[in-house]
């Protein structure tokens, strides 16, 4: 579960998950999102953030009820994790109930977006939290700076380490078949292909980046590269 010891004066055994790209960390995140509102209002606010990230109020953000029912109906492991976290005092003071937290988590797992929308979302992260199409600031640059390392280290399930080695840019995949990745200050890219590999990533979505990368100079680890490729000159608002 990757609980990290975080003792307090009143709970010296407190442990909390710090990685939002694993189930326990995602559930912890849900417990802290708009806790002052009821669950429906919390979901509406989260979906509005998705719209802002994906191009504004006209972005086709939706919600898939069958996915929600599937997530909710096969969640024994998540309930187990939730009770373990609750038992260790992991949840913050703003925590409402485990039922609210997990149901919101299942609902957020059921949000729908288009591939174009995911590319705009990735471009917003590449642009430091400023949507390149609408000009609206969604996240602060500091928040984006904190998000991208987590995406690089954990965004691709058990393939994350190999992805970081082969491709070297922050990315996030989902079991719906989407992979979106962020080249900071350059562009955001989204690939959707629903066939999954053995670890839950899109089979085709994990293939193109290495072969589509004509020059590695944008990668943080290629400090020996001095030339700048045409890839670096891509307009962040450009669509393929």
Predicted regions and their residues:
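Short, mixed-charge aromatic SLiMs
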Residues: 1-10, 50-59, 109, 142-158, ...
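Active-site-adjacent helix/loop patches that line small-molecule binding or acyl-intermediate pockets
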Residues: 1-108, 116-119
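Short glycine/serine- and small hydrophobic-enriched flexible loop segments
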Residues: 31-35, 123-127, 214
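Glycine-rich, acidic and aromatic/proline-enriched surface loops and short helix-turn segments
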Residues: 83-91, 124-127, 153-156
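Active-site-proximal binding-pocket segments
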Residues: 94-96, 112, 119, 123-134
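Short, conserved, surface-exposed binding loops centered on an aromatic residue
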Residues: 110-113, 139
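Structured C-terminal helix/loop/strand segments within mature extracytoplasmic catalytic/sensor domains
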Residues: 126-240
């Amino acid at each position: 579960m990757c609980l990290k010891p975080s003792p307090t004066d009143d709970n010296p055994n407190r442990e909390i998950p710090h990685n939002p790209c694993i189930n326990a960390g995602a559930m912890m995140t849900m417990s802290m999102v708009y806790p002052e509102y009821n669950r429906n209002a919390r979901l509406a606010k989260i979906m509005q953030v998705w719209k802002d990230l994906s191009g504004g109020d006209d972005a086709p953000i939706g919600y898939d009820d069958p996915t929600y029912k599937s997530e909710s109906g096969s969640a024994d492991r998540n309930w187990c994790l939730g009770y373990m976290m609750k038992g260790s005092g992991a949840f913050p003071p703003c925590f409402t109930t485990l039922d609210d937290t997990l149901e919101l988590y299942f609902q957020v797992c059921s949000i729908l977006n288009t591939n174009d929308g995911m590319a705009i979302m990735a471009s917003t992260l590449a642009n430091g939290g400023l949507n390149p199409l609408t000009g609206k600031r969604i996240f602060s640059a500091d928040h984006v700076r904190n998000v991208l390392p987590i995406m690089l280290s954990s965004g691709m399930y058990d393939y994350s380490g190999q992805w970081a080695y082969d491709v070297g840019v922050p990315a996030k995949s989902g079991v719906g078949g989407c992979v979106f990745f962020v080249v900071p200050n350059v562009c955001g890219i989204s690939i959707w292909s629903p066939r999954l590999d053995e670890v839950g990533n899109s089979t085709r979505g994990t293939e193109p980046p290495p072969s589509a990368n004509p020059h590695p100079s944008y990668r943080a680890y290629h400090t020996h590269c001095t030339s700048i490729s045409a890839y670096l000159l891509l307009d962040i608002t450009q669509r393929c």
